[in-house]
Amino acid sequence: MPAYNEEKNIGTVIEQWYPVVERIGGESRLVILNDGSRDGTYEMIRKYQKKYERLIGIDKPNEGHGGTILRGYHYAVDAGADYIFQTDSDGQTLPDEFWQFWKKRK
């Protein structure tokens, strides 16, 4: 999940999406890539990492949305992910919408 200047939203987004990761189980992770935010986005991610062991926060220089998504895909592939689902950190996609994709994965 790419994140840029989402300090005000990222906590809510984590709280919404983390139960999806827990429900899937196994080696599932919620990976958020901070794209060089100038606000407290990464600090918020780190705060939530203390609460959620399956949350991975990655801080990196700004590369823009596309570059950050690509970096996230590379991270997931290198980590051996069987499935990758990408959504943005602005809260526009709701976790309930995920399950229709998950059911079609086979």
Label for each model-derived stretch:
Residues 1-106:
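Structured catalytic core of nucleotide-sugar glycosyltransferases
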